[in-house]
Structure formats: C-alpha cells, structure tokens
Design a protein with these regions (language model features):
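Acidic/histidine-rich, surface-exposed loop or edge segments in extracytoplasmic proteins
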Residues: 59-72
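Short, well-ordered, aromatic-rich surface patches in folded extracellular/luminal domains
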Residues: 5, 21-40, 88, 95-154
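A short, structured loop/turn motif at beta-sheet edges
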Residues: 52, 75-84, 116-122
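Short, solvent-exposed loop/hinge segments that bridge or flank secondary-structure elements
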Residues: 39-52
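Hydrophobic residues embedded in beta-strands of well-ordered beta-sheets
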Residues: 55-58, 123
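Sec-dependent bacterial lipoprotein signal peptides
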Residues: 1-19
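Mature extracytoplasmic domains of secretory-pathway proteins
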Residues: 72-99
Length: 154
C-alpha cells in the first residue's frame, strides 16, 4: 500500500514537471505577439494593430477609405515588456482556442484579435467580439489593450 502511494506521488510529480516544462518551452519559443481591433462600418481609423517582438513594438492605424492615411510607428521593446507579454500566453490553452469565437463585428460591434507566432513558424490567431474576450484570454487582453492604448492615431 505504501509503495502504491509513493508510485502515485511520483506519477503526479512527473506529470506536473512535464506540464511545467512544456509551458516554459512555449514561453521561450514565442517570436511575436500581435493584437488588433477593427470595425466594419466606421469612418476614420477603423483598424488598429500592435505587433510586439523582442526588438520592436509596432503600431499601425488604417481606415477603409483612401481618404484616411494609414499611420505607423514603432518603439523599442524593453526586455521587461517583452517578458510580460510572453508570460501572458504561457500555456497551451491559447493554441486550443478556435480561430473565431462568437460573431466578431456583427452589427458593427467590432472585432478584436490576438495572434501568437512561435520561433518554429507555427502561428495561431483568435478573433472574437470586441470587449467579449474568452475567459482564457482575459488577463492577456487587458495587458494588450494597455499596450495598444499607446497607439495614438491622429
């Protein structure tokens, strides 16, 4: 009986260690995180995107008409900022989410999206209704919205 408890303990320990390693390796393998919003029926800057990697954070704004001149800017990404973004997707739950959740931009409600690109070329993008993010993304989206808020489209 005691031997079975010890075996069970080691099995649980092994599973926990394996899960942590896979999450940690995913964290280390993130190459880029992209986030954006869009509104189909709008005037002015209807699309706002931010792209974050270990070197730069790039911002862009665009509209649907030619009268709206697209804007772009970029700043250097600090190590602490990059680490804080990468840690947000420090699990496999993001990659298990469907590509589309709900009805993004239906009735001009707007859409938000997050895309994670890994060093091996794998990428996954999730699009969802504006300010109706899935529970798995709530902390990630809060941080990404904060970063995107620095994008001043004029």
């Amino acid at each position: 009986m005691k031997l079975k408890r010890v075996q069970l303990f080691f099995v649980i320990l092994l599973v926990t260690a394996t899960s942590s390693c896979s999450n940690e390796s995913l964290y280390r393998n993130v190459a880029q995180v992209n986030y954006g919003t869009s509104f189909g029926m709008c005037v002015g800057y209807c699309k706002r995107d931010v792209s974050i990697d270990s070197v730069y954070t790039s911002y862009s704004c665009a509209g649907w008409s030619k009268e709206v001149e697209p804007t772009q800017s970029k700043v250097q990404t600090t190590k602490s900022a990059w680490d804080s973004v990468k840690v947000l997707i420090n699990n496999k739950a993001f990659f298990e989410l469907p590509a589309t959740i709900g009805c993004p931009d239906c009735a001009d409600g707007g859409a938000e999206w997050v895309e994670v690109k890994l060093l091996n070329g794998t990428a996954h993008k999730v699009v969802f209704e504006y300010y109706n993010e899935p529970q798995q993304l709530q902390s990630s989206i809060a941080k990404l919205r904060q970063i995107a808020g620095k994008n001043e489209c004029k």
